[in-house]
UniProtKB/Swiss-Prot annotation:
One of its GO terms (cellular component) is nucleus. The gene is AFT2. The CDC motif is involved in iron-sensong via binding to Fe(2+) or [2Fe-2S] cluster, which leads to dimerization and loss of DNA-binding. Zn(2+) 2 binds at C86, C109, H133, H135. GO terms for molecular function: DNA-binding transcription factor activity, RNA polymerase II-specific; iron-sulfur cluster binding; RNA polymerase II cis-regulatory region sequence-specific DNA binding. Zn(2+) 1 binds at D53, H55. This is Iron-regulated transcriptional activator AFT2.
Length: 416
């Protein structure tokens, strides 16, 4: 993998010094992951053991950098500062043994490590100055140098069995051209970009762009605003027409009764009523109490009518029955008359007496030429309309036709 592609996928621990400056820190165990990319930044090694002598720094650094293929040598040294560099080890295959090595800058590796003693902290500070190499890092070439052989002998003297075992494995892999370190495996799962051996996970160096979060916040705000707008629309009052009729208003069952004034359609105060023609009057004539009372009274007054001839010019069907008694006629007329200004009282001769009859002055009342008898054959729920039509026609008789009252079926007139 190229070095440029590694810059955005490796996590670097950052610490703050006492002077307030940001610095990169890495432990010796995690230094390999820090060194896997090219960068020109200072990498502070922490923790660093307490060295008794400056000569102990080089074996400690060789133990860290040899597995990475870096052969370090001392470039400059004094009592309080030591500078190490990378020795460029090249293969001798195809080279003339008599030719001298070139001392040009193109063959010099810029990799540097600085070790400085801090008088205040009483310890050595080790910093990687430049993590750039101008050559290929190969461990198999390092194993052939004299410094590496001295390093292995020093480990045997210290009885560092763990380090000896590790380097023996590296030598065996290098002899068989096996990879020394498991290569970084690219991951397209979306959770992590790169996964290294020994469960080392690399994360982005810099903070990820906040565009996705901003977009998410914007979408969330939009959705919330839409929900709020919908809730506000639902909470707005809408104009509604409410038709409420009192249950105990119809004593007689007729709309012209003075007690039915309060049964007018009540419309609540709304902002606007667009169409007043859409009022529902279906429940206005549905009065079960009246229908039940009407059926009961009808059974009391009902007599078997005798069929007779009927003419189309007559308003009511002429059914010859017994003459209507004066008491029942007075009850029907007295309870139907009202003090409403829509009615006009007139005197109608009936035999030897004069009866007061109320006439409706409204234009929508049925007349002699209207379809009064159209609902006579309907079901139980329409009996009220039939009776109302017949009685309204009775009230609109002229004085000349009032003698036909004797031919009206008394069953059609309620005793209420």
């Amino acid at each position: 993998m190229k070095a440029k592609s590694m810059k955005s996928i490796i996590s670097v621990p950052i610490s703050v010094s006492k002077t307030g400056k940001m610095k990169l820190t890495a432990s010796p165990d995690n230094l390999a992951s820090m060194m896997s990319k090219d960068q020109n930044k200072l990498i502070h090694l922490d923790p660093v053991p307490s060295f008794e002598d400056r000569h102990e720094i080089k074996p400690w650094l060789q133990k860290i950098f040899y597995p990475q293929g870096i052969d370090i040598v001392i470039e400059r040294s004094d009592s309080s500062k030591v500078t190490f560099k990378c020795r460029s080890v090249r293969s001798k295959v195809g080279l003339n043994p008599k030719s001298k090595g070139s001392s040009s800058r193109s063959h010099a590796c810029p990799f540097r490590i600085r070790a400085a003693y801090s008088v205040r902290l009483q310890k050595w500070n080790v910093v990687v100055m430049n993590n750039i190499h101008s050559h290929e890092l190969r461990f198999d070439l390092i194993t052939k140098t004299d410094d590496y052989k001295k390093f292995k002998e020093n480990l045997r003297q210290k009885n560092d069995e763990k380090a000896i075992k590790t380097f023996d494995e590296l030598e065996y892999k290098a002899s068989l051209n096996l990879p020394l370190v498991t290569p970084i495996i690219s991951c397209d799962c979306g959770l992590t970009k790169e996964i290294e051996a020994f469960n080392n996970i690399f994360l982005p160096l810099s903070n990820p762009p906040l565009t996705s979060k901003k977009n998410l916040l914007k979408t969330n705000k939009n959705s919330v605003s839409k929900i709020k707008s919908r809730q506000m629309d639902n909470s707005k009052p809408r104009p509604r027409l409410k038709t409420k009729l009192d249950a105990d208003l119809h004593d007689t069952g007729f709309l012209d009764n003075f007690k039915t004034r309060n049964s007018c359609v009540k419309i609540e105060k709304e902002d606007s009523l667009t169409n007043l023609n859409e009022i529902d009057f279906t429940n206005m004539f549905c009065n079960d109490n009246f229908i039940q009372n009407y059926n009961q009274g009808l059974m009391e007054l009902l007599t078997e009518p005798t069929p007779g001839p009927s003419s189309s010019s007559c308003i009511l069907p002429s059914t010859p029955t017994r003459p209507l008694s004066q008491s029942k006629m007075d009850i029907a007329l007295s309870e139907s008359t009202t003090s409403s200004p829509n009615f006009m009282e007139t005197d109608a001769p009936y035999g030897d007496e004069i009866i007061k009859v109320s006439k409706d002055t409204k234009s929508n009342a049925p007349t002699a030429d209207t379809d009064i008898a159209t609902n006579l054959g309907k079901e139980r729920n329409e009996n009220f309309g039939m009776l109302n039509y017949n009685y309204e026609a009775l009230l609109h008789f002229n004085d000349e036709h009032f003698n036909e009252l004797n031919s009206i079926d008394p069953a059609l007139i309620s005793k209420y």
